[in-house]
């Protein structure tokens, strides 16, 4: 069995580690670098890494960088539209509405471009080890959703790698940090890389790494800081020369290179100068750029970006049930944490000096290699407990999002719950799988849908539909539904290539807080409607069964109150519906007594489950778990 390599597939740079005995070692590339630029260029041949980066200025439209930002995203996502304004290569709508890149008329999915980078890393590892490499552990941002994780796994498969495990980047970093540490510590891993930001709260020590909570922003990173510098340089040049460089792709590529360099220099220097001769030309001749940037100016340009990291930190601590003072160490990961303003912000929030004992560019790959060693059996007695970043569940009666698995649940995990039907003789139920934090289904993100068909004729509320969610150690979701009466079962593996955009993810959680009161009212209204609907159904059924056995006065009184409930259900006034329902409930007590007497005389017993969901959707309660059988389903993009 060959080595399992650990890969940090980064937005800006990627890194590979491998276990040699009990020690993780960095795999250097043929150019001598410990990290490889995540860049692919198309010329007469395909270039990857440093060689692709070097020719980017003269080949901007065919040089693809930061492809990770498009992984699992739809073309019409706000982040993709924003990215379109800043990148020189062409982004187009691909299969199923996904964001693809186009080079010389050919479309490439983000997974394909990522696979080219992974292929280069695989080749470098084989050259370093002197043996074939077929297995890998690949890291992803903790806040990557199911589709983005699946796309990453697909990229590995395209590159000829069996992805043994998808591991969260902050978790990998903590694994490397906590490797061989005996003392128990509560740590925060603050990971600000080239394209994404993650914060994870963990407990490490005595060979156990347990994630308590995670949060983040999958569209915040060094690329955004670079864009602020580029925009500043473009504005300064326009003020001085009256020429707008924002539409000049070659000039923008030079500015990107210079802006990134200036940003890095200002982490150690107080001032730097961007000097770009022959940046453009007009009728009067060639133009040169010479702009001085101070550290203070840079910090004023990116201050709001740095502040965006604070709220996820606050949420992660709250989810973990901890205060900032409870954290023993704050570990900095990702190149952007070298920026003084970032480390200062971290120190102010957590009230302690950040821990700089790990290499922020390599620690994630190191942790991935350690995880590879655990899977291969080379690293003993290390237990890693990770979590799922967002809640998962299904849509139930009235458009309510019923959670089966809460966010920050330790994975792998499996959860089942029993639901029922909403209509008499309902032949099928539609299972609408969702991910998010809002109470209402349409405020969350659809992962997929599938049908459980062939239900035998039965009154509403009688069928028992057991829905099971299964999340594996990679964070990838499987859902099944089983009719416990007939044993019929169908399932879906959530494999949609398009995923949640960062705006969607943030909307899910931020809206959940800012609209908490509104959500509460909506949910209360749905519950009251469900109660009223159930009471109307059972009352009408009882009236029909009793027939002539009920006197006209009682029947008239009940029917009047029944019609009143139906009228209030046409509106949105929860109080009015509740009052009408309470009136009907009191009036129908007599009816229930008569029905009970009738059943007793016939030797039968009243009862049966209450009604559940509407429109072919499931309705409500709990249950066990079973094996899964594949079935056809509609993939939602």
UniProtKB/Swiss-Prot annotation:
Keywords: ATP-binding, Chaperone, Nucleotide-binding, Phosphoprotein, Stress response. PROSITE patterns: HSP70_1, HSP70_2, HSP70_3. Residues 625-637 have a biased composition (Acidic residues). Residues 593-637 are annotated as: Disordered. It holds the Pfam family HSP70. Residues 604-622 have a biased composition (Gly residues). The modification Phosphothreonine is found at residue 196. InterPro entries: ATPase_NBD, Chaperone_DnaK, Heat_shock_70_CS, HSP70_C_sf, HSP70_peptide-bd_sf, Hsp_70_fam. GO terms for molecular function: ATP binding; ATP-dependent protein folding chaperone; unfolded protein binding. Induction: By stress conditions e.g. heat shock. Gene3D superfamilies: 1.20.1270.10, 3.30.420.40, Actin, Chain A, domain 4, Substrate Binding Domain Of DNAk, Chain A, domain 1. Disulfide bonds: none annotated. Acts as a chaperone. HAMAP family: DnaK. Belongs to the heat shock protein 70 family. This is Chaperone protein DnaK. The gene is dnaK.
